């Protein structure tokens, strides 16, 4: 059973924190550079002899508000919610164990949080901070991503739905969402914490489609262009029994928080923290 987490963090601010005001950290996030036509990138390293990616980034300093110092975020309004969500799984380096045990646990957490009729967990990523080695042969291991993005667009979310439930599946549903459940493997998280952009502050035109090329297929994601009205949040000192649940796509035609772009960031208060280790699963939440 999971619940919305609203307990304040009692940690006292250290001297020398780089903050805009209490509860807000000022940090750099990379955004898609404006004016890039037909941006594309690769899901892994650029293949030998292939064109260089056209997606280019610009860094902006943004204020990132600690959710422990404010009212809890609401999933339908903001596109994200922080859950108090204990896990019984600890062997996150064992991919088979994760698929057999953790996927079902996550499906139950998401279904409980959203009231969905069905939840299909279809893949996951384990991410490690830059100081930890990454096994090159493990496609589920990677570095924290330090640019603002969503994992799906309307087109790629529909393709995923068809892949999981067959052609025309959307015609049998009242609503479907693509969501991520993100949690630390070790805590507290100080290195590369996850920042989420309030979905209600994201203009549609700030979301730009980017072609994501893999050896076997081509997908599509959104990169975010910076705008001054965007509001960013994070949860300080996240523990293993906490998890972010956030939207990458929502088929509902209205609602403020249709998506919640996300990015890792470097917290200037913790430049020498232990490298982050985290796992995120991606899932479809189905409403009949």
Show the residue positions of the predicted features.
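Non-heme Fe(II) oxygenase catalytic core, chiefly the N-lobe of the double-stranded beta-helix
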Residues: 18-221, 226-236
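Intrinsically disordered, low-structural-confidence terminal and linker regions
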Residues: 1-18, 25
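Catalytic core of Fe(II)/2-oxoglutarate
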Residues: 221-288
């Amino acid at each position: 059973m999971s619940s919305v987490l609203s307990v304040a963090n009692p940690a006292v601010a250290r001297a020398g924190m780089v903050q805009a005001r209490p509860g807000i950290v000022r940090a750099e996030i990379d955004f898609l550079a404006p004016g890039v036509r037909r941006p594309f990138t690769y899901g892994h390293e650029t293949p030998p002899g292939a064109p260089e990616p056209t997606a280019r980034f610009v860094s902006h300093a943004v204020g990132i508000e600690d959710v422990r110092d404010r009212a809890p975020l609401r999933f339908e309004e903001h596109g994200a919610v922080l859950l108090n969500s204990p896990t019984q799984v600890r062997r996150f380096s064992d991919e088979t164990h994760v698929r057999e045990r953790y996927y079902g646990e996550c499906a139950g957490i998401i279904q409980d949080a959203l009231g969905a009729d069905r939840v299909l967990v279809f893949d996951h990523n384990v991410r490690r901070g830059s100081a930890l080695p990454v096994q090159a042969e493990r496609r589920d291991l990677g570095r924290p991503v330090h640019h603002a993005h969503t994992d799906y667009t309307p087109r790629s979310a529909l393709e995923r739905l068809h892949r999981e439930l067959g052609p025309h599946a959307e015609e049998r549903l009242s609503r479907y969402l693509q969501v991520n459940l993100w949690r630390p493997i070790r805590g507290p998280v100080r290195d590369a914490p996850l920042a989420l952009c309030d979905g209600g502050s994201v203009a549609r035109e700030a979301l730009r489609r980017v072609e994501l090329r893999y050896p076997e297929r081509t997908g599509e994601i959104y990169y975010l262009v910076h705008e001054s009205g965007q509001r960013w949040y994070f949860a300080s000192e996240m523990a293993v029994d906490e998890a972010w649940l956030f939207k990458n796509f929502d088929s509902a035609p209205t609602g403020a928080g249709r998506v919640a772009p996300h990015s890792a960031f470097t917290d200037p208060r913790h430049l020498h923290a232990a490298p982050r280790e985290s796992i995120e699963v991606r899932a479809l939440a189905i409403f009949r």
